[in-house]
Amino acid sequence: MYEGAVQELIDELGRLPGVGPKSAQRLAFHILEADPQDMKRLVEAITTVKERVKFCTVCGNVTEQELCNICRDPRRDPSIICVVEESKDVLAVERTRSFRGRYHVLGGAINPIAGVGPEQLRIRELLTRLNDGAIQEIIIATDPNLEGEATATYLARMLKSIGITVTRLASGLPVGGDLEYADEVTLGRAFEGRRNALS
Amino acid sequence: MYEGAVQELIDELGRLPGVGPKSAQRLAFHILEADPQDMKRLVEAITTVKERVKFCTVCGNVTEQELCNICRDPRRDPSIICVVEESKDVLAVERTRSFRGRYHVLGGAINPIAGVGPEQLRIRELLTRLNDGAIQEIIIATDPNLEGEATATYLARMLKSIGITVTRLASGLPVGGDLEYADEVTLGRAFEGRRNALS
């Protein structure tokens, strides 16, 4: 055990996700020896985020204002909503530059073991957005894992009754990948989702 | 890119050692969603460490006072000094409970590529400590790698002329290890350092 303040810092750092005891110690000693100005900037960055960053009241994405910059942007197509699990996923989709609609961040995926049911997600807010009739398509872009698939199925069934086009991101071989190393589920999906080679 | 504050936090976190862009993003979102009280504690821990923690004026170990708790402890044998590279190493030696002397933290190891020569280490402070004649043995416990070995050799040669017993930690097979998997240098050292099996 180190003396008071150092050990306390190691403990606090060790509570962060993906930071084990050894990393916490290394980070603590880095902080200890780092330039005080750099550490002041780090502390301010944490404080600012906690004080200023909120979640967009419409889509749930992170923002420093009432609405996020995508919901504020009049050039974004309001008739298509891409439903994702986390704010991080918004950025991932944005990087593709192939989606010009709006988003809806659920805040997670259905995961009964972790106690996350549909009520814990921002599904009610999604239904509210559908009320004005402007939305024509919902693209479900949850993670292609157990929880994401369960959430997608739940949403698809629920939205079917409303009569809106509901689509799901294609599953298949990753571009640049190797067919030989694809797992059987992915390869199976690639077969199911095969497309006309001439189109 | 995220909006201002979030991206700034990701950038600051990404500057920490061992934190890549993905980890920085994950940490930033954890901080964003975490309990404000927890984050306040983290910020306070960083601030406190930067404000309060100093280096012991005698041995260079981390401390919140003028002298570290080992240098302050009258039960520690003042005639033996264990020379280590970092404060972390003090803790590692302390955990063995087999050393009851004092320490001297060099603050690194000789590494010409990184621009660290003997002048950048706390070697002058070590020589000052030897002046009072109370010290009878110096145990060099630098890391068993290239830089640590170079530092050990440098110190051993320098201290030889002063006429103090200078020892180096034994190299050999790690306890609980497997002879078959030991690298040839370690195994070679284990042969060189072999001891009478009956002693």
UniProtKB/Swiss-Prot annotation, chains A, B:
Ranges of residues in domain Toprim: 79-174
Domain of life: Bacteria
Keyword Transport in annotation: no
Zinc finger (C4-type): 56-71
GO-annotated molecular function: DNA binding; zinc ion binding
GO biological process: DNA recombination; DNA repair
Listed SMART domains: TOPRIM
Keywords from the UniProt entry: DNA damage, DNA recombination, DNA repair, Metal-binding, Zinc, Zinc-finger
Entries under PANTHER family matching the protein: RECOMBINATION PROTEIN RECR
Family: Belongs to the RecR family.
Protein role: May play a role in DNA repair. It seems to be involved in an RecBC-independent recombinational process of DNA repair. It may act with RecF and RecO.
UniProt protein name: Recombination protein RecR
Name of the coding gene: recR
